[in-house]
From Swiss-Prot:
GO cellular component, as recorded: extracellular region
Name of this chain's protein: Thrombin inhibitor rhodniin
SMART domains: KAZAL (SM00280)
Family annotation (InterPro entries): Kazal_dom (IPR002350), Kazal_dom_sf (IPR036058), Spink4-like (IPR039932)
Lineage of the organism: Eukaryota, Metazoa, Ecdysozoa, Arthropoda, Hexapoda
MF GO annotations: serine-type endopeptidase inhibitor activity
Organism, as annotated: Rhodnius prolixus (Triatomid bug)
Disulfide bonds: 6-31, 8-27, 16-48, 57-84, 60-80, 69-101
Coiled-coil annotated residue ranges, if any: none
Signal sequence range: none
Amino acid sequence: EGGEPCACPHALHRVCGSDGETYSNPCTLNCAKFNGKPELVKVHDGPCEPDEDEDVCQECDGDEYKPVCGSDDITYDNNCRLECASISSSPGVELKHEGPCRT
């Protein structure tokens, strides 16, 4: 993506990003944010758990079909699925409107 190189210290202070990735320190997370992941935020100190985003997504199993349109113009089965996507596959996606996206 041709982003700017970042001069981050080699200090190890792991943080978990909203994309489910573990960054070696807050600087490397901010570097990723400014180089192609503008919606990236720190979720918590320490490494991400391997199934961190899967737990939230599993909570959606069995939820009723009530389609919503995300800000990425993708129709999600329900608001829970949209929230799941916002922390995993589509960081930063928000509710655009209820009902399926218009094509």
